[in-house]
């Protein structure tokens, strides 16, 4: 077993995951607040469940970044600059909210796969 040496690639990938996770969290919360229509109750609850589960996951990743000796990204402005996600319109339809969040979550999964691969390559 080789010794683990944190690489800039791992840290950069994890920092991107934090930024994009915060973007998904914020957009999910906006959808939670603004959803309307016949699916209101089910979507309102689903959006709340998602953003509630995202926060502790983001915290865990940020703490891993610190454990690797780097600083976790902070500040909403900085996170917004780092995030590579489109914003959701506040007045989006419920259907558009679901489509948007589905695409945002798929992009986040791709970031997570990249971070996993970088960590694996580094022996983490």
Features from the language model and the residues they span:
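Disorder-to-helix initiation segments
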Residues: 1-17, 94
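Helix-loop segments that flank and shape redox-cofactor active sites
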Residues: 2-9, 24-49, 111-124
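Short alpha-helix boundary/capping motifs
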Residues: 6, 49, 56, 75, ...
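Conserved acidic
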Residues: 13, 39, 46, 97, ...
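N-proximal short alpha-helices
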Residues: 16, 20-27, 34, 70-74, ...
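Alpha-helical transition-metal enzyme core signature, strongest for iron centers
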Residues: 17-28, 47-61, 65, 105-112
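Conserved alpha-helical segments that form or flank metal/cofactor-binding pockets of metalloenzymes
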Residues: 36-78
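Acidic/histidine-rich alpha-helical segments that form the ligand environment
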Residues: 63, 80-124
